[in-house]
Amino acid sequence: KGLFESNAIEIIEITKLGEENGDKTVAVDSFEDNNLVFIDEGHRGSSGDKWKINRDKLSENGFAFEYSATFAQAINAAGTKKKELENEYTKAIIFDYSYKYFYNDGYGKDYSILNLSEDSDEIKQTYLTASLLSFYQQMKIYESSKGMIKPYLIEKPLMVFVGSSVNAVRTESKKQVSDVVDVLLFIDEFIKSKSESIANIDKIMSFDSGLQTTKGVDIFENKFSFLETTKLNASQLFDDMLNLIFNASNGTLHIENLKGVDGEIALRIGENEYFGVINVGDSDKLVKICEANGMSIASRDFSSSLFKTINDTTSNLNILVGSKKFSEGW
């Protein structure tokens, strides 16, 4: 009502901006030139690609506000354009609230980067089991602290596996595999090989994983202090992980291509509730690779997106697999 009563608000994706008007593009020159442009994650495209050129055109005779916690890192990685970008941005900083400042104020994510010197199947299984154990610990803390953390609007934990391309395929032992298939093979192995999984959990919780820092300290030492307070043994931890993460007590991993929904694959154990979803461009291709690697696959008619329910308070989805775009939310 009022000022904008007769003006419709049109929303378009930035990928639809182009040099000329077309069936699927809108020319940048179509916009009036007195524009106020807000740019989140402004470091993206700062090296001079098409998006940078378009946004500069949009604000050429207007004003642009750019936000990013990692401008400095992006500029340092800009190669030959580093000096040019320094000259452009250093004279235009309104407020320096880069990553180290907002992290110290409590807004950043805690992270742990553990680079492995080798990636044998045994080491990968141990490492991914520890990752799953870490996620399980987060879920247990969330479940036990709901009342206390409610005022802070903290959502239920979600485990996210991201890659540069969900369908990036390589050949190993004459079979096509991918990072996504590796994750699914791990989950399948973790569930069906109960005794091996329990043994891995026991080694991790005993700080005897076989993975050590350069100083000879187990890399998982002091990582599971909350789980230690539960006094659960490795077998009990395994059973509770199946229940809390996979919505099951036992069974086989089922990979279901959701027909009627573009690019979604659902994950479940047996006939239990779905515990995960894969968001991928070519779901048929990925399902075929899974089948070639001996996994249980099926197609199921599905009328609505499973992925879009992931933020629902009643959602049973605990694992998301997708491209690196999900590392910044959705």
Regions found by a protein language model. Name each.
Residues 1-9, 144-320:
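Conserved C-terminal RecA-like helicase domain
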Residues 3-21:
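Mechanochemical coupling/switch segment within NTP-driven translocation systems
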Residues 15-150, 157-159, 308, 323-330:
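Signature of the SF2 helicase/ATPase Hel1-core->accessory helical subdomain module
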